[in-house]
């Protein structure tokens, strides 16, 4: 497995066959300009066999439905993303409209279940393991909004930002069924130890989730872990990487 900033296109193997690549990047917050060659080097060469995973705060399904202007703008942005040849996958962050996301159609995807947002855009459920291009990828979105006091419930903040009991149970069951062995972990926030290594203090409101991720870090065998949320691009350890603008591949 290889993890690097995306740049040169390694699209063909030694026999000249097209190679499928899984790319990973951080929070996009509904910014359509992120999905271009300037901000994602090599993006213009990605094809229908390629996948891009966003580590939460996708942000293109955010506006309350009664905000007609914002909804029109979001539909236009999603229309543009649906024209991309590659598949866009994302875990939930904390700045998402969970009511709208959870009403999306649930479909089988890569051995798990996902929410279909558009024909090529899917929300990956919490606590699932997806097998994508031969890689077992465990997903656990969500985080606590430290700015929730500035937000309006069900207009700019939703309580489903943190996992519920069912999602924790699903995660534990799924990991145990996989003998606690995966290739890649994708989350929005990070384990408590990693948060401290970034120079932050774990928020007590978030401790159930960050504590669970701490357990995952110690109990699960994994090769790479990517997370967003903290708006920094940093290789925290040899195996764990904070993502924001950088694009990494996990061929």
Regions inferred by a protein language model and the residue ranges of each:
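Catalytic metal-binding/acid-base residues of hydrolase active sites
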Residues: 28-29, 58-59, 94-97, 143-144, ...
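Active-site-proximal loop/helix segment associated with metal-binding centers of metalloenzymes
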Residues: 112-113, 117-119, 128, 132-207
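Structural motif
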Residues: 24, 52-55, 184-188, 226
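Binuclear metal-dependent phosphoesterase catalytic core
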Residues: 131-133, 214-219, 230-251
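Core catalytic region of metal-dependent phosphoesterases/phosphodiesterases
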Residues: 25, 30-132, 200-202, 209-213, ...
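Active-site-proximal beta-strand elements of phosphoester/diester hydrolases
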Residues: 20-29, 134-143, 186-188, 241-244
């Amino acid at each position: 497995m290889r993890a690097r900033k995306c740049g040169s296109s390694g699209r063909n193997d030694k026999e000249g066959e097209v190679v499928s690549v899984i790319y990973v990047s951080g929070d996009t917050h509904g910014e359509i300009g992120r999905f271009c060659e300037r901000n994602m080097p090599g993006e213009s060469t990605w094809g229908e066999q390629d996948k891009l995973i966003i580590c939460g705060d996708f942000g293109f399904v955010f506006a309350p439905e009664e905000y007609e202007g914002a909804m029109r703008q979001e539909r236009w942005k999603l229309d543009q993303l649906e024209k991309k040849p590659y598949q866009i996958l994302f875990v939930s962050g904390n700045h998402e409209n969970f009511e709208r996301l959870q009403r999306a159609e649930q479909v089988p995807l890569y051995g798990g279940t996902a929410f279909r947002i558009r024909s090529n855009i899917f929300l990956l459920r919490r606590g699932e393991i997806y097998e994508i291009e031969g890689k077992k990828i465990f997903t656990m979105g969500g985080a606590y909004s430290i700015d929730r006091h500035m937000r309006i419930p069900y207009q700019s903040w939703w309580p489903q930002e943190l996992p519920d009991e069912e999602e924790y149970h699903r995660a534990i069951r799924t990991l145990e069924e996989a003998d606690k062995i995966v290739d890649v972990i994708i989350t929005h926030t990070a384990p408590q130890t990693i948060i401290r290594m970034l120079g932050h203090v774990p928020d007590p409101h978030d401790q159930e989730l960050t504590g669970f991720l701490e357990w995952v870090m110690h109990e699960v065998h994994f090769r790479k872990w990517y997370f967003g949320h903290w708006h920094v691009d940093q290789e925290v350890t040899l195996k764990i990487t904070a993502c924001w603008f950088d694009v990494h591949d996990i061929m």
